[in-house]
Protein backbone atom coordinates (compact mmCIF):
# COMPACT_ATOMS: atom_id res chain seq x y z
CA UNK A 1 0.00 0.00 0.00
CA UNK A 2 2.83 2.37 0.82
CA UNK A 3 4.57 1.61 -2.50
CA UNK A 4 1.31 2.13 -4.40
CA UNK A 5 0.79 5.40 -2.61
CA UNK A 6 4.29 6.54 -3.57
CA UNK A 7 3.72 5.78 -7.27
CA UNK A 8 0.26 7.31 -7.15
CA UNK A 9 1.75 10.46 -5.67
CA UNK A 10 4.46 10.53 -8.34
CA UNK A 11 1.87 10.06 -11.09
CA UNK A 12 -0.24 12.85 -9.66
CA UNK A 13 2.75 15.17 -9.50
CA UNK A 14 3.62 14.45 -13.14
CA UNK A 15 0.02 15.02 -14.17
CA UNK A 16 -0.05 18.35 -12.37
CA UNK A 17 3.16 19.44 -14.09
CA UNK A 18 1.70 18.67 -17.51
CA UNK A 19 -1.60 20.30 -16.58
CA UNK A 20 0.18 23.43 -15.42
CA UNK A 21 2.27 23.48 -18.57
CA UNK A 22 -0.88 23.14 -20.65
CA UNK A 23 -2.54 26.02 -18.80
CA UNK A 24 0.55 28.18 -19.18
CA UNK A 25 0.66 27.54 -22.90
CA UNK A 26 -3.05 28.33 -23.27
CA UNK A 27 -2.66 31.58 -21.34
CA UNK A 28 0.43 32.59 -23.30
CA UNK A 29 -1.48 32.19 -26.55
CA UNK A 30 -3.81 35.08 -25.67
CA UNK A 31 -3.63 38.75 -24.74
CA UNK A 32 -6.43 39.76 -22.40
CA UNK A 33 -7.69 43.32 -22.75
CA UNK A 34 -10.18 44.81 -20.33
CA UNK A 35 -13.07 46.92 -21.55
CA UNK A 36 -15.30 49.22 -19.49
CA UNK A 37 -18.36 50.71 -21.20
CA UNK A 38 -21.92 51.84 -20.43
CA UNK A 39 -23.86 48.96 -21.98
CA UNK A 40 -26.99 49.99 -20.08
CA UNK A 41 -28.25 53.25 -18.61
CA UNK A 42 -28.72 56.75 -20.00
CA UNK A 43 -25.73 56.72 -22.37
CA UNK A 44 -25.87 53.06 -23.36
CA UNK A 45 -25.76 53.88 -27.07
CA UNK A 46 -22.19 55.12 -26.57
CA UNK A 47 -21.04 51.92 -24.93
CA UNK A 48 -22.90 49.52 -27.19
CA UNK A 49 -21.50 51.16 -30.32
CA UNK A 50 -17.98 51.52 -28.90
CA UNK A 51 -17.91 47.83 -28.00
CA UNK A 52 -19.00 46.96 -31.54
CA UNK A 53 -16.02 48.90 -32.88
CA UNK A 54 -13.69 47.20 -30.41
CA UNK A 55 -15.05 43.75 -31.27
CA UNK A 56 -14.64 44.43 -35.00
CA UNK A 57 -11.01 45.47 -34.56
CA UNK A 58 -10.25 42.42 -32.42
CA UNK A 59 -11.89 40.10 -34.96
CA UNK A 60 -9.83 41.61 -37.78
CA UNK A 61 -6.58 41.38 -35.85
CA UNK A 62 -7.22 37.80 -34.72
CA UNK A 63 -8.19 36.71 -38.24
CA UNK A 64 -4.89 38.15 -39.47
CA UNK A 65 -2.93 36.07 -36.95
CA UNK A 66 -3.27 38.13 -33.79
CA UNK A 67 -0.53 40.20 -32.18
CA UNK A 68 2.83 38.49 -32.57
CA UNK A 69 0.91 35.22 -32.92
CA UNK A 70 -1.25 35.78 -29.85
CA UNK A 71 -5.03 36.16 -30.07
CA UNK A 72 -6.74 39.07 -28.30
CA UNK A 73 -9.49 38.29 -25.80
CA UNK A 74 -11.76 41.14 -24.63
CA UNK A 75 -13.08 40.95 -21.08
CA UNK A 76 -15.85 43.54 -21.03
CA UNK A 77 -17.67 45.12 -18.09
CA UNK A 78 -20.79 47.31 -18.00
CA UNK A 79 -20.45 50.39 -15.78
CA UNK A 80 -23.91 51.79 -16.66
CA UNK A 81 -22.30 55.20 -17.13
CA UNK A 82 -21.76 55.47 -13.35
CA UNK A 83 -18.29 56.30 -11.94
CA UNK A 84 -18.61 54.04 -8.88
CA UNK A 85 -19.38 51.09 -11.13
CA UNK A 86 -16.45 52.01 -13.36
CA UNK A 87 -14.21 51.65 -10.30
CA UNK A 88 -15.72 48.27 -9.43
CA UNK A 89 -15.27 47.09 -13.02
CA UNK A 90 -11.64 48.22 -13.10
CA UNK A 91 -10.83 46.49 -9.82
CA UNK A 92 -12.41 43.27 -11.06
CA UNK A 93 -10.51 43.39 -14.35
CA UNK A 94 -7.15 44.06 -12.75
CA UNK A 95 -7.37 41.86 -9.64
CA UNK A 96 -9.43 38.88 -10.78
CA UNK A 97 -8.71 38.90 -14.52
CA UNK A 98 -5.16 40.28 -14.16
CA UNK A 99 -5.39 42.50 -17.24
CA UNK A 100 -2.69 45.09 -17.88
CA UNK A 101 -4.45 46.94 -20.70
CA UNK A 102 -7.87 48.58 -20.27
CA UNK A 103 -9.96 50.43 -22.85
CA UNK A 104 -12.55 52.67 -21.20
CA UNK A 105 -14.61 54.07 -19.87
CA UNK A 106 -16.37 56.46 -22.24
CA UNK A 107 -17.77 59.47 -20.43
CA UNK A 108 -15.30 61.80 -18.74
CA UNK A 109 -16.60 61.18 -15.21
CA UNK A 110 -16.36 57.40 -15.55
CA UNK A 111 -12.93 57.43 -17.18
CA UNK A 112 -11.63 59.89 -14.57
CA UNK A 113 -12.80 57.63 -11.75
CA UNK A 114 -10.25 54.93 -12.59
CA UNK A 115 -7.22 56.92 -13.76
CA UNK A 116 -5.49 57.00 -10.37
CA UNK A 117 -6.02 53.25 -10.00
CA UNK A 118 -4.59 52.62 -13.46
CA UNK A 119 -1.56 54.79 -12.80
CA UNK A 120 -0.88 53.26 -9.39
CA UNK A 121 -1.20 49.74 -10.80
CA UNK A 122 0.82 50.53 -13.94
CA UNK A 123 -2.07 49.50 -16.13
CA UNK A 124 -2.31 51.16 -19.53
CA UNK A 125 -5.70 52.88 -19.77
CA UNK A 126 -6.93 54.16 -23.12
CA UNK A 127 -10.06 56.29 -22.83
CA UNK A 128 -11.70 56.22 -26.27
CA UNK A 129 -14.04 59.18 -25.90
CA UNK A 130 -13.45 60.95 -22.57
CA UNK A 131 -12.75 64.54 -23.60
CA UNK A 132 -12.20 66.27 -20.22
CA UNK A 133 -8.66 67.75 -20.17
CA UNK A 134 -7.90 66.36 -16.71
CA UNK A 135 -8.27 62.70 -17.71
CA UNK A 136 -4.56 62.24 -18.42
CA UNK A 137 -3.35 64.24 -15.40
CA UNK A 138 -3.06 61.06 -13.32
CA UNK A 139 0.17 60.06 -15.03
CA UNK A 140 2.03 58.44 -17.89
CA UNK A 141 -0.01 55.23 -18.12
CA UNK A 142 -3.16 57.12 -19.15
CA UNK A 143 -3.97 57.78 -22.81
CA UNK A 144 -6.99 58.73 -24.87
CA UNK A 145 -8.09 58.32 -28.49
CA UNK A 146 -10.17 61.49 -28.75
CA UNK A 147 -9.49 65.22 -28.86
CA UNK A 148 -10.17 67.21 -25.68
CA UNK A 149 -12.88 69.66 -24.62
CA UNK A 150 -10.89 72.89 -25.09
CA UNK A 151 -10.28 72.00 -28.73
CA UNK A 152 -13.85 70.82 -29.26
CA UNK A 153 -15.35 73.94 -27.69
CA UNK A 154 -13.01 76.09 -29.77
CA UNK A 155 -14.09 74.23 -32.92
CA UNK A 156 -17.73 75.02 -32.13
CA UNK A 157 -17.03 78.70 -31.53
CA UNK A 158 -14.98 79.08 -34.72
CA UNK A 159 -17.60 77.24 -36.74
CA UNK A 160 -20.36 79.50 -35.42
CA UNK A 161 -18.55 82.70 -36.36
CA UNK A 162 -16.66 81.64 -39.49
CA UNK A 163 -19.07 79.21 -41.18
CA UNK A 164 -22.48 80.23 -39.85
CA UNK A 165 -21.58 83.92 -39.68
CA UNK A 166 -23.16 84.22 -36.24
CA UNK A 167 -22.72 87.44 -34.25
CA UNK A 168 -24.89 86.79 -31.18
CA UNK A 169 -24.69 83.49 -29.29
CA UNK A 170 -26.65 81.99 -26.43
CA UNK A 171 -25.32 79.07 -24.41
CA UNK A 172 -27.34 76.54 -22.40
CA UNK A 173 -25.25 74.03 -20.45
CA UNK A 174 -25.26 71.55 -17.54
CA UNK A 175 -23.45 73.26 -14.66
CA UNK A 176 -22.93 69.90 -12.89
CA UNK A 177 -21.33 68.12 -15.85
CA UNK A 178 -17.58 68.61 -16.45
CA UNK A 179 -17.98 67.79 -20.13
CA UNK A 180 -20.70 70.39 -20.61
CA UNK A 181 -18.87 73.06 -18.60
CA UNK A 182 -15.61 72.48 -20.47
CA UNK A 183 -17.17 72.86 -23.89
CA UNK A 184 -19.19 75.89 -22.82
CA UNK A 185 -16.16 77.77 -21.49
CA UNK A 186 -14.10 77.22 -24.61
CA UNK A 187 -16.96 77.92 -27.00
CA UNK A 188 -17.48 81.30 -25.34
CA UNK A 189 -13.76 82.16 -25.60
CA UNK A 190 -13.58 81.21 -29.27
CA UNK A 191 -16.86 82.90 -30.17
CA UNK A 192 -15.82 86.16 -28.55
CA UNK A 193 -12.33 85.91 -30.06
CA UNK A 194 -14.02 85.63 -33.45
CA UNK A 195 -15.83 88.92 -32.93
CA UNK A 196 -19.10 87.54 -31.58
CA UNK A 197 -21.04 88.51 -28.46
CA UNK A 198 -22.52 86.03 -25.98
CA UNK A 199 -25.95 87.50 -25.24
CA UNK A 200 -27.22 84.76 -22.89
CA UNK A 201 -25.41 82.22 -20.72
CA UNK A 202 -27.93 79.92 -19.03
CA UNK A 203 -27.41 76.72 -17.04
CA UNK A 204 -29.35 73.78 -15.61
CA UNK A 205 -28.59 70.76 -13.42
CA UNK A 206 -28.08 67.14 -14.41
CA UNK A 207 -31.43 65.36 -14.61
CA UNK A 208 -33.53 68.46 -15.29
CA UNK A 209 -36.37 67.95 -17.77
CA UNK A 210 -37.95 71.41 -18.03
CA UNK A 211 -35.81 74.10 -19.67
CA UNK A 212 -38.52 76.60 -20.54
CA UNK A 213 -37.43 79.25 -18.03
CA UNK A 214 -33.91 79.33 -19.46
CA UNK A 215 -35.18 79.17 -23.03
CA UNK A 216 -37.49 82.14 -22.45
CA UNK A 217 -34.47 84.23 -21.43
CA UNK A 218 -32.56 82.98 -24.45
CA UNK A 219 -35.42 83.83 -26.80
CA UNK A 220 -35.64 87.36 -25.37
CA UNK A 221 -31.89 87.81 -25.97
CA UNK A 222 -32.43 87.21 -29.71
CA UNK A 223 -29.34 85.11 -30.51
CA UNK A 224 -28.52 83.94 -34.02
CA UNK A 225 -26.99 80.68 -32.73
CA UNK A 226 -27.55 78.56 -29.60
CA UNK A 227 -24.78 76.32 -28.23
CA UNK A 228 -25.94 73.24 -26.28
CA UNK A 229 -22.98 71.14 -25.05
CA UNK A 230 -24.53 68.00 -23.57
CA UNK A 231 -25.33 64.36 -24.30
CA UNK A 232 -27.92 63.35 -26.88
CA UNK A 233 -30.77 62.48 -24.48
CA UNK A 234 -30.80 65.91 -22.84
CA UNK A 235 -30.14 67.70 -26.13
CA UNK A 236 -33.22 66.08 -27.66
CA UNK A 237 -35.37 67.40 -24.80
CA UNK A 238 -33.88 70.89 -25.00
CA UNK A 239 -34.20 71.09 -28.79
CA UNK A 240 -37.87 70.09 -28.63
CA UNK A 241 -38.68 72.78 -26.06
CA UNK A 242 -36.50 75.32 -27.87
CA UNK A 243 -38.38 74.88 -31.15
CA UNK A 244 -41.73 74.95 -29.34
CA UNK A 245 -40.72 78.37 -27.99
CA UNK A 246 -40.34 79.51 -31.59
CA UNK A 247 -36.54 79.70 -31.60
CA UNK A 248 -35.55 78.79 -35.16
CA UNK A 249 -31.85 79.71 -35.08
CA UNK A 250 -29.14 77.11 -35.71
CA UNK A 251 -28.14 74.99 -32.74
CA UNK A 252 -24.58 73.75 -32.25
CA UNK A 253 -23.03 71.17 -29.93
CA UNK A 254 -20.27 68.65 -29.34
CA UNK A 255 -19.68 64.94 -29.81
CA UNK A 256 -22.23 64.14 -27.11
CA UNK A 257 -24.82 64.74 -29.82
CA UNK A 258 -23.76 61.52 -31.53
CA UNK A 259 -26.84 59.37 -30.97
CA UNK A 260 -29.45 62.02 -31.81
CA UNK A 261 -30.25 60.33 -35.11
CA UNK A 262 -32.08 57.53 -33.33
CA UNK A 263 -33.42 59.57 -30.42
CA UNK A 264 -34.75 62.86 -31.81
CA UNK A 265 -36.92 64.30 -34.56
CA UNK A 266 -37.00 67.34 -36.81
CA UNK A 267 -36.43 69.68 -33.86
CA UNK A 268 -32.68 69.05 -34.24
CA UNK A 269 -32.61 70.02 -37.92
CA UNK A 270 -30.51 73.11 -38.55
CA UNK A 271 -28.25 71.51 -35.97
CA UNK A 272 -24.48 71.08 -36.21
CA UNK A 273 -21.99 69.31 -33.96
CA UNK A 274 -18.28 68.61 -33.68
CA UNK A 275 -17.26 64.98 -33.95
CA UNK A 276 -14.30 62.67 -34.39
CA UNK A 277 -14.98 61.45 -37.91
CA UNK A 278 -17.58 61.52 -40.67
CA UNK A 279 -19.18 58.28 -41.78
CA UNK A 280 -19.53 59.69 -45.30
CA UNK A 281 -15.83 60.60 -45.55
CA UNK A 282 -14.13 59.54 -48.78
CA UNK A 283 -10.88 58.61 -47.01
CA UNK A 284 -10.17 54.94 -47.96
CA UNK A 285 -9.44 53.83 -44.38
CA UNK A 286 -12.75 55.29 -43.22
CA UNK A 287 -14.73 53.65 -46.00
CA UNK A 288 -13.08 50.27 -45.32
CA UNK A 289 -14.05 50.56 -41.65
CA UNK A 290 -17.61 51.65 -42.47
CA UNK A 291 -18.03 48.83 -44.99
CA UNK A 292 -16.73 46.18 -42.57
CA UNK A 293 -18.88 47.53 -39.73
CA UNK A 294 -22.02 47.52 -41.87
CA UNK A 295 -21.30 43.98 -43.04
CA UNK A 296 -20.96 42.77 -39.44
CA UNK A 297 -23.73 44.77 -37.74
CA UNK A 298 -26.04 45.91 -40.56
CA UNK A 299 -25.82 49.52 -39.38
CA UNK A 300 -23.54 52.53 -39.85
CA UNK A 301 -20.87 53.14 -37.17
CA UNK A 302 -21.02 56.28 -35.07
CA UNK A 303 -17.96 58.07 -33.69
CA UNK A 304 -17.86 55.95 -30.55
CA UNK A 305 -17.54 52.83 -32.67
CA UNK A 306 -14.71 54.46 -34.62
CA UNK A 307 -12.90 55.54 -31.44
CA UNK A 308 -13.22 52.08 -29.93
CA UNK A 309 -11.87 50.58 -33.15
CA UNK A 310 -8.94 53.02 -33.18
CA UNK A 311 -8.16 52.36 -29.51
CA UNK A 312 -7.58 48.68 -30.23
CA UNK A 313 -5.39 49.37 -33.25
CA UNK A 314 -3.35 51.97 -31.34
CA UNK A 315 -2.64 49.39 -28.66
CA UNK A 316 -1.96 46.67 -31.25
CA UNK A 317 0.55 48.87 -33.06
CA UNK A 318 2.37 49.70 -29.82
CA UNK A 319 2.62 46.05 -28.73
CA UNK A 320 3.88 44.99 -32.17
CA UNK A 321 6.53 47.71 -32.22
CA UNK A 322 7.55 47.01 -28.62
CA UNK A 323 7.91 43.32 -29.41
CA UNK A 324 6.87 42.48 -25.86
CA UNK A 325 3.91 42.57 -23.48
CA UNK A 326 5.98 44.36 -20.85
CA UNK A 327 3.67 47.20 -19.89
CA UNK A 328 6.37 49.84 -19.39
CA UNK A 329 7.83 49.05 -22.81
CA UNK A 330 4.42 49.19 -24.50
CA UNK A 331 3.69 52.50 -22.77
CA UNK A 332 6.93 54.00 -24.06
CA UNK A 333 6.13 52.98 -27.63
CA UNK A 334 2.51 54.12 -27.35
CA UNK A 335 3.74 57.61 -26.43
CA UNK A 336 5.49 57.77 -29.81
CA UNK A 337 2.35 56.96 -31.82
CA UNK A 338 2.39 58.67 -35.20
CA UNK A 339 -0.05 57.09 -37.60
CA UNK A 340 -3.26 57.22 -39.58
CA UNK A 341 -6.42 55.82 -38.02
CA UNK A 342 -10.13 55.97 -38.83
CA UNK A 343 -10.58 59.16 -36.80
CA UNK A 344 -7.57 60.81 -38.42
CA UNK A 345 -3.81 61.14 -38.18
CA UNK A 346 -2.79 60.86 -34.55
CA UNK A 347 0.19 61.85 -32.46
CA UNK A 348 0.29 62.51 -28.72
CA UNK A 349 1.31 65.69 -26.95
CA UNK A 350 3.32 65.62 -23.71
CA UNK A 351 0.18 64.88 -21.69
CA UNK A 352 -0.90 61.96 -23.90
CA UNK A 353 -3.69 63.98 -25.52
CA UNK A 354 -4.11 63.30 -29.25
CA UNK A 355 -3.20 66.02 -31.67
CA UNK A 356 -5.78 65.54 -34.41
CA UNK A 357 -8.47 67.31 -36.41
CA UNK A 358 -12.22 67.46 -35.80
CA UNK A 359 -15.13 67.46 -38.21
CA UNK A 360 -18.39 69.38 -38.08
CA UNK A 361 -21.48 67.41 -39.01
CA UNK A 362 -24.96 68.62 -39.94
CA UNK A 363 -28.19 66.86 -38.99
CA UNK A 364 -30.39 66.39 -42.05
CA UNK A 365 -33.26 64.29 -43.37
CA UNK A 366 -32.14 61.75 -45.97
CA UNK A 367 -34.53 59.18 -47.45
CA UNK A 368 -36.92 59.99 -44.64
CA UNK A 369 -34.34 59.29 -41.93
CA UNK A 370 -32.53 61.70 -39.63
CA UNK A 371 -28.80 61.41 -40.26
CA UNK A 372 -25.52 63.31 -39.90
CA UNK A 373 -23.52 64.47 -42.91
CA UNK A 374 -20.06 65.97 -43.23
CA UNK A 375 -19.93 69.78 -43.21
CA UNK A 376 -16.28 70.79 -42.73
CA UNK A 377 -12.96 69.87 -41.06
CA UNK A 378 -11.23 71.97 -38.41
CA UNK A 379 -7.53 71.32 -37.79
CA UNK A 380 -5.71 71.78 -34.45
Residue ranges and their predicted role:
Residues 1-32, 63, 377-380:
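Short, low-complexity disordered leader/linker segments with a strong preference
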Residues 25-26, 45-52, 64-136, 204-211, ...:
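Beta-alpha junction/loop-to-helix N-cap segments that form part of ligand/metal-binding clefts
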Residues 86, 145-168, 181-183, 210-212, ...:
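Hydrophobic alpha-helical segments within soluble ligand-binding/sensing domains
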Residues 142-203, 225, 315:
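An alpha-beta-alpha
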Residues 183-274:
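Extracellular/periplasmic bilobed ligand-binding domains
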Residues 239-309, 363-364, 370-379:
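Extracellular/periplasmic periplasmic-binding protein-like sensory domains
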